[in-house]
């Protein structure tokens, strides 16, 4: 693949000339603490970051809007109850085209995972540091570098007096790293386009599909007693160790995982089978007290073909309840004290055609710059799924660095970031068209 015109050559050169600005904007974004929230956390620098982006886009002539969503207090499967967006605005901006072209959504999330263990970083994670051709810092690849690349692509087109025929919708959201609620709120607000790109660090591949997640906390009842005293049978009032009883539940998860690996309905051309992974265990109150309860939280990943008719993961939940209940059915204790399931965080998977015109356009633009990617899947989840399910076919496409996402010394190569920004600029020209 090659550049197709003198205009495209000028656009690529304009992005490359803006390398220092791209690194500088990435540094500004990394310096703002937008660590993904835990329940009850106060706002951090989310509003400052969104205002910074809005100002850059307004300078290009974009109509911008920042808003703090107000979800219902009770929440639902997709937005946690009581989630407060005060101080955590979403940003939408529209660069209107001249008319007659296809519109595009450029999406990114501004939250980043925490920096612990901070003392293991080579440098301050909130100070972007260049080392051996790489930029180190929290969010360097996931995904403040990608967001900066989107902005620089738009600025490069503006400097070359390129007006697109189709509209560009730019949207940055919060809460991708936690509940996915920011993307949900953007969709509810009406954000959308003919198709879209989310700037995740894909190493120039196109993540056109992903797995989704449901999260159960399963509580096992026991009966407290003195751990150092012999106990009667539980039917006679003896203590029951909830931690020991939990073992059968964990074994049931392992058996279900192996079954899913072997089942034909868990085969997907781009994704691993569904999975169930215990991630948190809480039980016991004192070292010499037999625990009266124990709970395990699990991360359950499911495939696009397992989304039910209502667009949820309830069918997966029902299967897990049935199978884990069966796993403990031979124990009379569980007949009288059944497992208790509490569910949260249904982030729903999605997929779009690997040969969608925007996918082939973006991959072709990257190939013209020497970056050859292909359609692929993400075994985790991303905001692109939310926009896809809402009617804007969206895939993730971005620079290198995913192998260090969420890790100490997260990094992205300078060359990769520049080429990503140039690929986006080319994609805008080819997808949206240029005003005559």
Pin down the residues of each PLM region.
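Metal-dependent amide/peptide-bond hydrolase catalytic core
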Residues: 1-10, 14-17, 34, 59, ...
